[in-house]
């Protein structure tokens, strides 16, 4: 009996060690699962982040491509304000300073009314204005002796040199550019530019027969004060119409080129280019 009791104890004794080993193995497995789960979750989260970044990046490419493909009238790549020069003249034409713009347009309108409707001549108007100004100042200066008041302070007027030089330089550059364009058109290198120049001069000759130079200048000034501002507000509606018109003009020019212009003999400069 004692031997059996010892044998039973020897059999029962190892059980706690086995249980400890099993528990350790279970803990290891659980920790491994937790570790792998964290890795997978982190990898999945990183992959999700990458997917989200891709999703956010994908819509930007078509919008940028659409922006680059938007047609602008006359192929402009800058705002209307920059096209007009971007300085004070552009501010006036775009009505950035409403008082100054209204003053310039009102002065031009008054001058047109005086010279065109009232049929005043420029030299006559200048002489009459100078007569009135000199007479008023002369009488005022002499009248101060009798009424014991100070004479009028007549300001000294000087024309600054720098603005005049800048204006002359700008005019010189534009005139030289116009001369070079006319020379290029007359040399026979570009038939398309030649036809555009002839059509433009023909339209101007018709307008010149209907209006005098002062009226044409006033109409051009009014257009400068109205058309750029209206186009800047409604460019999204005007540009598609301009694109359709340009496509139609190109089609008509292609037909004209095929039937008429291609049969016209070109100048020697064009033949030299081909050689």
Swiss-Prot record:
The modification N-acetylalanine is found at residue 2. The keyword Transmembrane applies. It holds the Pfam family Reticulon. Residues 89-274 form the Reticulon domain. It comes from the Eukaryota. Disruption phenotype: Shows reduced levels of Agrobacterium-mediated root transformation. GO terms for biological process: endoplasmic reticulum tubular network organization; response to bacterium. Induction: Up-regulated after Agrobacterium infection. It is a multi-pass membrane protein. Plays a role in the Agrobacterium-mediated plant transformation via its interaction with VirB2, the major component of the T-pilus. Interacts with VirB2. This is Reticulon-like protein B1. The lineage of its organism: Eukaryota, Viridiplantae, Streptophyta, Embryophyta, Tracheophyta. The gene is RTNLB1.
């Amino acid at each position: 009996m004692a031997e059996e009791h010892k044998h039973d104890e020897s059999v029962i004794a190892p059980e706690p060690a086995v249980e400890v080993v099993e528990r350790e193995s279970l803990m290891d497995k659980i920790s491994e699962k937790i570790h792998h789960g964290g890795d997978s979750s982190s990898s999945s989260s990183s992959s999700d982040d990458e997917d989200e970044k891709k999703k956010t990046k994908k819509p930007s490419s078509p919008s940028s491509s659409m922006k680059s493909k938007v047609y602008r009238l006359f192929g402009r790549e800058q705002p209307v304000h920059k096209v007009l020069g971007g300085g004070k003249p552009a501010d006036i034409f775009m009505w950035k300073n409403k008082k100054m713009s209204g003053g310039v347009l009102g002065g031009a309108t008054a001058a047109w009314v005086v010279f065109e409707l009232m049929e005043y001549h420029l030299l006559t108007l200048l002489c009459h204005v100078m007569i009135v100004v000199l007479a008023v100042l002369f009488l005022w200066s002499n009248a101060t002796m009798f009424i014991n008041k100070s004479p009028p302070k007549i300001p000294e007027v000087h024309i600054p040199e720098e603005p005049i030089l800048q204006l002359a330089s700008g005019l010189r550059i534009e005139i030289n550019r116009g001369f070079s364009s006319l020379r290029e058109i007359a040399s026979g290198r570009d038939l398309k530019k030649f036809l555009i120049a002839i059509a433009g001069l023909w339209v101007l000759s018709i307008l010149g027969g209907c209006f005098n130079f002062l009226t044409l200048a006033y109409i051009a000034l009014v257009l400068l004060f109205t058309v750029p501002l209206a186009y800047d507000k409604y460019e999204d509606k005007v540009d598609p119409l301009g694109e359709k018109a340009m496509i139609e003009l190109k089609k008509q020019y292609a037909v004209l080129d095929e039937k008429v212009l291609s049969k016209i003999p070109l100048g020697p400069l064009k033949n030299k280019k081909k050689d």
